[in-house]
């Protein structure tokens, strides 16, 4: 655990010492600068759970106070909704701590839809029933409408990586675009 939070997530990715007040202040001010200079709408924070929890929580609090309509998406690569919900702002699961992170990434949806694409929904817990069963845990999220859903990203294989099945992609995209999530 300390290797993840106090050093190196992987050997090619050294951490910045966010416990150092000068480093922390630089990161906050740098975020403000990019928001103002480039007029960006949001930040996707990679490997969110592996940074210093208190520093990240305070960073999010400062960003939310300075820019209330601004959003940060935290990559929380866990495939169970209870673990993902723990990281969302105002989660009762993490109380009394608060990450202040408005949007978490729904790796459960990604995982289930990518398994379901090769299965028929003819028995319980197979096919699209897997996706449904991940949605039943929405009550764990303080704000399920602010969860980011996706069928692939830059860290994963392409959804159609195993062949061209346009109807399957259309069905997955329809589900992605109509579910109670940020697509």
What do the predicted segments below correspond to?
Residues 150:
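Ligand-binding/active-site lining segments
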Residues 18-30:
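Alpha-helical scaffold elements lining the catalytic groove of polysaccharide deacetylases
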Residues 1-17:
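Aromatic- and acidic-residue-enriched carbohydrate-binding clefts of CAZyme catalytic domains
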Residues 182-183:
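Short helix/strand-capping turn motifs
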Residues 157-161:
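Surface-exposed cleft-lining segments at the edges of enzyme active sites
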Residues 30-32, 36-143, 147, 164-166, ...:
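Active-site-proximal helices and loops of the catalytic beta/alpha 8
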